A protein has these predicted regions:
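N-terminal glycine-rich phosphate/pyrophosphate-binding loop and immediately adjacent elements
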Residues: 2-128, 439
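A conserved FAD-binding loop/helix module that cradles the flavin
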Residues: 54, 465-487
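Rossmann-like flavin
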Residues: 94-190
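A glycine-rich dinucleotide-binding beta-alpha-beta segment and adjacent secondary-structure elements
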Residues: 169-183, 187, 405-469
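Helical element adjacent to the flavin cofactor pocket in flavoenzyme catalytic cores
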Residues: 196-248
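Mid-domain catalytic core of redox enzymes
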Residues: 208, 238-357
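Active-site-proximal substrate-binding core of FAD-dependent oxidoreductases
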Residues: 242, 488-498
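C-terminal segments that line or cap access tunnels to active or ligand-binding sites in enzymes
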Residues: 309-420
């Protein structure tokens, strides 16, 4: 039986672990933190529970792509609460709200009511989204349907380039990209294919996870252990050991040694390179390229506990923009931050499948560049000093003020709040510069910002959000890519069909 060490217990590490364990590998996952799950993990404050990264998922209705993957990974027990089908995302541009509905017909009809002169163009846009999603065998889970020409074209054209070529109304152009904080898109850089996959993912169906996203991590861990694998926390890998040809094991911070026939790294590529110091199998050019990778912007979050019975539950996500355009919010200045924000409620555990009447807690999320918190890098969580706490409070008050202006009554409903910065993400997940979604895609750099799942070390592979895309579907597609290297794609597709 081959011994497999997986570094990191995020969704990529856990899902790879389950697939390999059920196919005969002896899997051990090593997690640096005290809690499993990476961006799936949750935390409690003052009696309420908050999610940190995975707030809602798509395509989880029976027969849809994510539902099939969840079934394959034996996650049929995950509770789901459907977001409003008539408006799962609400985009607010300079005070005017637009709703995005699930399903082809409702999506087109709803936007056509506000933009009747654009109906044909909306149909063209939606058809293209579906065509791109279907053209990817990985995203459609139809192995024979891969269309390389379509995939390539929309990986090298930017979101704004394609949207502007289809849609003529400038307001509608902005509405269609209004949820871009979900992938930290940048104008002229982010490929349209990224937008298409994410739009298709949520347009099919959208759900929150009652009780929190850590249910996914716990379910995968239970399944892994049932197949004989294990997850160990407080095990930060500091070195990957190699002989002259291959990796042989890892060393953790507590100086434990773990021998391995195969190593999977579910970490940011920059962290992987740090584990491979003085390893001649890795060339200097590769190290330099990894360190030069562009990363998506970080985020500042305010986690709010509401006074009981004061905040009606929002069964949708709210994207609020001060200006008519959602673009360039990451290019804020000290004077105009925040240019935009994402506002969501957490779905509490529900026993009867009903939609809650009131929210217990919610989150505000806006962009924050790492340079704003870099002076505190190297300090420990909870011990960064009074200046850091004052900085966070000032930012939180500004973000709450802006959200309250767009959503009156929000501030009055807050009983208490807590915050996180890009530094929090760096310390808990190891993502470079606290980046929300890891490595950024940039059509102008082409393959230079694409991270291969394979390395020059034959038995060392990468998985997680950096090798394909982030989010539930993006990471699981990356998992299939990585595991196909070991089991063949045919084996995995056949198992998914079973």
């Amino acid at each position: 039986m081959k011994r497999c060490i997986i570094i990191g217990s995020g969704l990529g590490g856990l899902s790879c672990g389950v697939i390999l364990a059920r196919n005969g590998y002896q899997v051990t996952i090593l997690e640096q933190g005290t809690q499993i799950g990476g961006c799936l993990q949750c935390f409690r404050r003052d009696g309420v529970k908050f999610e940190t990264g995975m707030h809602f998922i798509g395509s989880a209705e029976r027969g849809q792509t994510l539902h099939r993957l969840m079934h394959y990974l034996e996650m049929d027990n995950i509770p789901l609460s459907r977001l409003d089908k008539h408006g799962y995302d609400v985009i607010s541009l300079s005070g005017e709200c637009f709703r995005l509905a699930n399903g082809r017909g409702p999506f087109i009809e709803q936007l056509s009511e506000r933009f009747p002169h654009e109906t044909d163009h909306i149909v063209t846009y939606y058809d293209l989204i579906e065509e791109i999603a279907r053209a990817s065998s990985l995203h459609s889970l139809r192995q024979a349907d891969n269309n390389a020409a379509i995939n390539t074209e929309y990986q090298i054209r930017s979101i704004d380039n394609v949207v502007d070529s289809i849609i003529t109304d400038p307001i509608l152009r902005n509405v269609l990209v209004g949820n871009l904080p979900l992938y930290a898109a940048e104008k002229g850089k982010t490929p349209f294919a990224t937008h298409a996959f994410i739009t298709d993912f949520y347009n099919q169906s959208a759900f929150r996870i009652p009780g929190g996203s850590d249910a996914i991590a716990h379910s995968l861990t239970d399944t892994l252990r049932r197949y004989g694998g294990d997850v160990m926390t407080r095990k930060k890998v500091t070195h990957i050991l190699c002989d002259s040809e291959k990796a042989t094991g890892v060393v953790t911070e507590d100086e434990s040694h773990y021998a391995a026939d195969l190593i999977l790294a579910s970490v940011h590529p920059s962290r992987l390179v740090e584990m491979l110091l003085d390893i001649p199998l890795i060339r200097p050019a590769y190290r330099a390229r990894i360190h030069q990778l562009p990363n998506t912007t970080g985020g500042f979050a305010v986690y709010m506990k509401f006074k009981p019975g004061t905040m009606p539950y929002l069964n949708h996500n709210y994207y609020g923009y001060r200006d008519p355009s959602p673009w360039a919010c990451e290019q804020y200045t000290d004077d105009d931050w925040p240019r935009g924000f994402l506002y969501m409620h957490m779905c509490p555990t529900v026993t009867d499948g009903s939609i809650p009447r009131f929210a217990e807690c919610g989150e505000l999320l806006s962009y924050m560049r790492f340079d704003e918190v870099e002076r505190w890098k190297g300090t420990q969580v909870g011990h960064r000093g009074a200046d850091y706490e004052a900085f966070k409070q000032a930012k939180a008050e500004r973000l709450i003020d802006e959200a309250n202006r767009q959503c009156p009554g929000l501030r009055a409903a807050i009983a208490a709040y807590w915050t996180s910065t890009p530094l929090t993400y760096l310390d808990y997940t190891g993502t470079e510069a606290g980046s929300m979604y890891g490595v950024a895609k940039d059509i102008n750099k082409g393959a230079a910002c694409h991270v291969q799942h394979k390395t020059k070390i034959p038995n060392l592979l990468l998985t997680g959000q950096n090798i394909n895309s982030h989010g539930m579907l993006g990471v699981l597609v990356g998992t299939i890519v990585t595991c196909s290297e070991l089991l063949t794609a045919e084996t995995i597709y056949q198992q998914i069909k079973e």
